[in-house]
Structures are given as C-alpha cells and as structure tokens.
C-alpha cells in the first residue's frame, strides 16, 4: 500500500497562517498535550510550524488555552471543580467549556458516582484531532485541521512503534472480526465481538462521520466513500457527538447492525478504540484501509500490534489454489503469496 500522505512536501505541513503573531498560551498547550517524545523531553522545540501549534490555534482562544492548561490531559473535571481551579464566573466558564467542546478541543461524559457532567481535555489522537474533523463547521472554516489529524496520527509514533506490545497497550485501534466469518466454537474472548459492545452500551448509539475520510478529503486524497455514519459512538460519547455538532444522530441497535453489514459488504474493517482498557470503548469504527490512519500507521511502520486482533490468519494448504484473493482483501497484510504458497 502506498500511503500518499507520507510523501507530501514539508511545506504542506507548515503553519498555514505565518502572518499571524505567535501565541504563547497555544505553544504551552500544544506541548502539554502532545505525545511526541522529543518535544516532551525538551530535545525538540515546539514552534509555530509544529502541528501541535497550528492545529490548536484556529479552534482555541488564549483564554480557552489557559483554561485547558489547568485541566491536565485526560483528567475529568466537573464544572464546580473547574470553577475552583480557574476562579472564573460559573456561567462564563460553562459557556467557554461548551464552546471548547463544540470546537473539538474538549469532550465530556458523566462517568462518576454522582453522574455529573465532567469535561475532559483529550489527547490529540485519539481525541481532539478526530473531533475537529468530524465537525463540518470547523473543518470548512479551517481545512488545515485535516492535515493536522494526519500529522498527529503519525509523528508521535515514528519513534515508538517498534516498542508497541501485542494488543497495542492503548495505542492505535483493536480489530474485531465479522462474527459470521468466525466459527462460533472458537474460544474468542467476548471483547472481540461486536455483539458484546452493542449489548454493553444497549440503547446508547449514535452514527457519526468518519474523521479519517473527512480529513483526507481536505487535501484531495483518500477514496470516494461517503464519510457519513461510519463511526458508531457508544455510551456517553454518543451524546457528545450528537450535542456538539459532530454530525452524530442517535440510532437503534438494528440500525447499527445494518451499518456493520454495509461495512462488511464493502470490505471495511471493524475497529474499536484502545485507550481505556479492556472493558471500555467509546466508538466502533468501520475502516477503509485506503484512508484509515490507524491501519496506515500500523502498516507504514510495520507494527501490526497497533491494529491487532485476537485472531491469527491460517491457510489450509490442501484447499489453497493460490488465487491471491485473501492477500488482496486482507487489510492488515496477514497473509502473503510466495511461489504458489501462502504464509
């Protein structure tokens, strides 16, 4: 697979608005959120040409950046807690937090004993890079967000992919199979099954746009897929994508199954998010190998653990006629065709 995005000239990824003054709060926030090890350790300086800067600048005021800097990354805080740490007026602060959520800088959920709404500053990927691309209003006004998503799905992983253990360790995505293609006597663990997750989040689903497909279109790459409705948000994330302009709409379990069937008919890959342990996800994606950044990154760096399944491809040699169809269709490159032999 030739991932064209990797061959773009460096000028494609510089600050699209060099005429604007550099904003210190944005630099600080970009450094706090980024997963890029050289920047975290101080070996590389974050500048206005860094995607962490020019990806945040269009969607975040200096005041909002200072609010986010007090939150910490992936540390949920209720509105009352935010009032305490910022000292801001509650109504004004709530207005800012809701705007930050609409723009995709923040997400929110109700995952606490009191079931009280809490705001979260997410990672770039998975996180704000996807959310900004899902929001058509933001993406139309700031098409550079498409390139921002591409950069942040690759740059942080360039140095660490060889160290990713089986299962991904919370990095990348986790492939789940089309259940009807798996022998039901197989000792598959339940988290591998779409049905497990649909039952776990019963009644809380929202179909939303694919951020990878939308991102690619901003720089004229990808495929001809309609980006709408391929990402199935579950749980509190379903409310988030519906309420914050991310193109989400609530669907039934039957409608979700119809989307998965349509994805299977198109040869797409079911993937679940992989950052919150084995018993929590926030979405089931239906990924096209031609545009999916998670699949791209795992194959580009030869790190299949990043998009690993609990299943292993095996060939029944006596039945194989070396037609090559399985090689053509497998998005993870799990089988190869040699001299009339499959491995």
Language-model-detected regions and their locations in the chain:
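A short, conserved structural fragment
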Residues: 101-112, 335-336
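Ferredoxin-like iron-sulfur electron-transfer modules
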Residues: 88, 119-121, 272-279, 283, ...
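Short acidic, hydrophobic short linear motifs in intrinsically disordered regions
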Residues: 74-86
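Short, amphipathic alpha-helical interaction segments positioned at domain boundaries
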Residues: 114-156
